[in-house]
Amino acid sequence: NSGNPCCDPVTCKPRRGWHCVSNPCCDNCKFMRAGTICNRARGDDMNDYCTGISSDCPRNPYKD
């Protein structure tokens, strides 16, 4: 994706020194801080939080 400043246009991977290209826990090419809400609670489900080591938003396996 040549329009994404985080993406190396040749490899489509994060540019050198950057952690990520996209996903809910990626902000300005870096992983978001652990504990940042990446998916708000709905119904009886709980919030999902970034881990600080990945750009993915892991699902919280617990219910309220």
Curated annotation (Swiss-Prot):
Keywords from the named record: Cell adhesion impairing toxin, Disulfide bond, Hemostasis impairing toxin, Platelet aggregation inhibiting toxin, Secreted, Toxin
PROSITE patterns membership: DISINTEGRIN_2
Statement: the UniProt record of this protein carries the keyword Oxidoreductase: no
Record-linked SMART domains: DISIN
Motif range (Cell attachment site): 42-44
GO process terms (BP): cell adhesion; negative regulation of blood coagulation
GO molecular function, one term: toxin activity
Expressing tissues: Expressed by the venom gland.
Pfam families registered for this protein in UniProt: Disintegrin
Disulphide-bridged cysteine pairs: C6-C29, C20-C26, C25-C50, C38-C57
Main location: secreted
Domain Disintegrin as annotated: residue spans: 1-64
Alphabetized InterPro entries for the sequence: Disintegrin_dom (IPR001762), Disintegrin_dom_sf (IPR036436)
UniProt cross-references to SUPFAM superfamilies, sorted A to Z: Blood coagulation inhibitor (disintegrin) (SSF57552)
Cellular component, GO annotation: extracellular region
Location within or outside the cell: Secreted
Functional note: Strongly inhibits ADP-induced platelet aggregation on human platelet-rich plasma. Also avidly binds to the laminin-binding beta-1 integrins (alpha-3/beta-1, alpha-6/beta-1, and alpha-7/beta-1) in an RGD-independent manner.
Subunit annotation: Heterodimer with subunit alpha; disulfide-linked.
Similarity-based family: Belongs to the disintegrin family. Dimeric disintegrin subfamily.
Protein name (record): Disintegrin lebein-1-beta
Organism, as annotated: Macrovipera lebetinus
Lineage: Eukaryota, Metazoa, Chordata, Craniata, Vertebrata
